[in-house]
Amino acid sequence: MSDPIVTSSKMEKSAEFEVTDSALYNNFNTSTTASLTPEIKEHSEESRNGLVHRFVDSFRRAESQRLEEDNDLEDGTKSMKSNNHLKKSMKSRHVVMMSLGTGIGTGLLVANAKGLSLAGPGSLVIGYVMVSFVTYFMVQAAGEMGVTYPTLPGNFNAYNSIFISKSFGFATTWLFCIQWLTVLPLELITSSMTVKYWNDTINADVFIVIFYVFLLFIHFFGVKAYGETEFIFNSCKILMVAGFIILSVVINCGGAGVDGYIGGKYWRDPGSFAEGSGATRFKGICYILVSAYFSFGGIELFVLSINEQSNPRKSTPVAAKRSVYRILIIYLLTMILIGFNVPHNNDQLMGSGGSATHASPYVLAASIHKVRVIPHIINAVILISVISVANSALYAAPRLMCSLAQQGYAPKFLNYIDREGRPLRALVVCSLVGVVGFVACSPQEEQAFTWLAAIAGLSELFTWSGIMLSHIRFRKAMKVQGRSLDEVGYKANTGIWGSYYGVFFNMLVFMAQFWVALSPIGNGGKCDAQAFFESYLAAPLWIFMYVGYMVYKRDFTFLNPLDKIDLDFHRRVYDPEIMRQEDEENKERLKNSSIFVRVYKFWC
C-alpha cells in the first residue's frame, strides 16, 4: 500500500549528518602502527597509550558541528538547527523499559508522605484522581501534536513559540529546563533521606559523594552506560511496584504482618482526612494537587519517541492506552493501597514532625505491620529509583540546555557537543548545579527538599498548560486558515474540549496553590512569606522570564495571530483517502481475527 504521508512544500529537508570517529580511528591506527614489532611488550604499551589518547580526544568539539538558521516562519520565529545530532546508542529494550519506569521516583515514592501526613488518605486519592483526568487530556493533546509535527526542532518545547508567543515559549522552556536542573540535587537529597531509614545518625554527605561521583562517571563515559544502567534501574522499579501491590493486598487482608485484617480501619481512625476545619481539609486537597503533578511529571516525554516510530498513526493510540494503565495501576492503585495500610498520623511520615521523618510510605506500609526483611528490600529499590531519576535528570537537562542554546534561548557557549555526542559544557553546568544536593547534611534538609519539589511540581503545570494551549491554538489556526482536520494523522480522543478543561483546571490549581502557599496548612491561617516562596517560587520565576524576554526583545506580542501561524513548518500531512482505506482494512482484519486478538487490541 502506498504511503499516506504527503510532505508539505514548506517542510524543510535538512540532511542528517552522522558524526563519525573516523579521524579518531585513523589517529589510533597511526599511533599503533609503529608498535607492530616483535616485542609484544612494546605493542601492549602503545595500544594502551592509543586507548588513552582516544578517550581524551573524544572530549574535543565535533569538527562538523555548525548551526544553520531558518527564517521560514511567517511570524519571524527562528529555528536554530544543528547539522549534527547527539548519538543515539540506546536499543529498543532500553526505550520500552524507560517508557514504563522513567519518572517513578521521588514524587511518587517519597514526597507523598508529606501529603498523606498533612491531608490524609481521602485527600490523597481525590487529588490524584483529579490530576489523572488532566494527565489523560494532556497525553491526548501531546499525541495529536506529536504525530502532526514529529520532526519539529525542540519538540513540544517549540509548540509554545509557534502557536502562542515567543515570550511564552522562552519562559516555559527555560522553566522546564530549570525543573530538570533542580531534579538532580532534589534526588540526591532524597537519596540521603532514604538511607537514613537504616541509620539516621550517619553523615549524609558520604552517600551524596558516592552517588554524585557514580552519576558523573556514567555520563562522562557516554550514552551507552546511561542506557544500560537505566534498563537495570527501571526493571527494579517495575518489579517493586508490582510486588508492592501484591504485598499490600496480602497485608490488608491479614495474610502477612501481626495486625490481622485491616480493611478500611485507618479511614475511620485516625480518619480519611486530616483533623481541622473544612477550609483546612480543602487546603489539604489543594496541596495534594501540586504533589500529584510532581509525581506525574515526565509522562509527557512519550512524545519524544513518536518521530522514531515507523507508523506514528498506529503507535500513538497504543502509547495513549499504556499511559492510562500507568495512571491507574502505578499511581492511583498504589495511592489507594497506601491509604489503607498507613495511618496518616504516623510519626515517621515526612512532615509529621516526628523524630524520624524520613521513611517512604511504601516502606511504612510493610514495616509498621512488623513484616520483616521486605521493608529493607523496598527501601533499597526506592533508593535505586531515586538514583535512577537523578540519572535521567543528568541525561535530559544538559541536552535540553544545549537545545536552548541552538534555538538562541541560551548562551551559545553551551552549544558544545564533543566527538562522542556529549553536550559537554552543558553537562558540566548541570553537574555543578547538583552540588546543591550537599545541603542534605544540614538541619534544613527537609526544607531544601520542599523548595526543590515545589519548583518541579509547578513547572509541570506550566509545561502541560503550554502543550494543551498550543493544541487549542493549532485547532483554531487550522479552522481560520481553511485547513481540514482530515489532514491530521491522529486526532485527540478528547478533542479540543479536553485541552480547554485541562488549561482551565490548571488555572484553578495555580490559584489554589497561591492560597495554600500564602496561608500554609498548620499555620493557623496566618500568612508566611518564607512558606509562600517555598511553595510558589516557580510562578514568579516564570513571570520574570516572560516579562524580561518581552522587554529585552521589545516584542510585546501576547498571542501570535492565528492567520499568521505557519502550520506547515515541519508538519507531516496525511492523505485522508489513504487513511480511510487503511482504517477500513484494519477493521476488516480485526473482525476476522480470533477473540484473543480482538481483546488484546481493545485493551492494548
Curated annotation (Swiss-Prot):
Keyword Phosphoprotein tagged: yes
GO molecular function, one term: amino acid transmembrane transporter activity
Topology relative to the membrane: Multi-pass membrane protein
Residue ranges that the UniProt entry lists as topological domain Extracellular: 117-119, 191-206, 260-284, 345-377, 445-449, 524-531
Residue numbers of Phosphoserine PTMs: 14, 79
GO cellular component: endoplasmic reticulum; membrane; mitochondrion
Transmembrane helix found in the keyword field: yes
GO biological process, one term: amino acid transport
Membrane spanning stretches: 96-116, 120-140, 170-190, 207-227, 239-259, 285-305, 324-344, 378-398, 424-444, 450-470, 503-523, 532-552
Disulfide bonds: none
Ranges of the Cytoplasmic topological domain: 1-95, 141-169, 228-238, 306-323, 399-423, 471-502, 553-604
Family: Belongs to the amino acid-polyamine-organocation (APC) superfamily. YAT (TC 2.A.3.10) family.
NCBIfam families in UniProt: 2A0310
Known role: Involved in transport of isoleucine, leucine, valine, cysteine, methionine, phenylalanine, tyrosine and tryptophan.
Name recorded for this polypeptide: Valine amino-acid permease
